[in-house]
Amino acid sequence: MLNTTDYLIIALYFLIILVVGVLTGRKQDREEFLISGRKLKSLQATTTIFSSRIGAAILLTYTALVYMYGLGALWYFIGSVFGLFLFYFFGVKVKKMADEENFYTLPDFFFFLKGKFAGYLATLITIIITFGWVVLNFTAGAKLIAEYTPISYDFSVIIVGVIILLYLLAGGFDAVVKTDIIQTIGIFLLFVLMIYLLITTDTKPGLDFMDLFSLPAMQIISFFLAGFFIPMASPELWQRVYAIENKKHFRRSLFLSSLFYLIIGFILLLIGLVIREDIPDIAADTSLIVGFSMLLPAGLAGLSVVIIYSSVSSSADTYLFTTSASVTQDFLEKTGFAKKKENLRLVMRYSMLGLMILGITMALILRDIVDATFFFVSLTMSLGFVTLAIWIYPRLNRHSVNLSIFACLIGVIIPAIIVGISESLIIYAWGFCIAGILIGILINYIRPARL
């Protein structure tokens, strides 16, 4: 449990990010509210890319996978490294196109290249994916608070959602970027705590190279594909690419954020192996939280609450804003429900409020972090695979694009209902994506579509 000092630190953190959000929101125009005026420099871009990626999906889910599967979970990170390396080259092209066409969201890429139907399908997937990550991070933040304090899980979910909503309503995307700088400092403090734990613990993580191949082949493929395709279909990463000032800052920030991400991932692997050895038979999805509470000294354990919460918060605010942007710009504006001459910031604020309420409700229902991650990562495959296909072959016909996205949606939801949620959903998603493209090629041969 936390002491008075710990509670004061948490309260101070909440106060700082709220003040930053309010001050950021003053005298903003539409472009600044939506995408920071497309003028992010290397430092801002590096911190916001890095901190948005170090959320529940990496801190809790990845540690849970290490706790369950040992060194074999590293395949997820190996896939991520390859995916980020590929995105380094792809992102340059996207950046150039976004600057010329004024893109704001990932679906804008599909609207521009493959038409309205593909754009709306991409919008549907984007909203589901990003909202899923909102729920996942709400759940993670609430479990963290409930583990360390007398506050119940249900009330913790409300606290997490309301705090994030308040500074987003005030400052928009600029608030996300500026609070990410604060939260990146917290993540580096977490890095220091993890190093301290590795040095002081009597248990040393065992790294046997052959343990990488101890998993069944299908699990290895699933973990690798999950990591590989995420950058190509991460709406929040695309939004940051659009917001960066130029290609030079893009290349520098993506390289640095990827390097920091890789370092944190390796340290988390070691921490997960230590917790797996020292504290068997605990719930995997809270293994990092429980591990810190039991293995760190009392004062440092309290500090870890603030740091882990700041990491989860930095992802939750990103995904909530990205979801709201896609709902408002890709759906309400493009379908005519919201007129462009209307106050877009007001519409987005109502959207964020509605999404926050829905997110809290879903977080009260869906409490398994690992299963939720597999489900939403599988849906990510639909956009990631098609985006890669379009990059490799820009003339890919619209039938293939539309059917691949739609087939993946079916190929994830139906097996999840019938078979259940596991890492095998990623293989189903991959297979249905390929099938959709092939069927589209056949249909296009019979009835050619516009490119």
Could you tell me what each predicted segment is?
Residues 1-451:
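Membrane-embedded helix-loop-helix hairpins and adjacent transmembrane boundary segments
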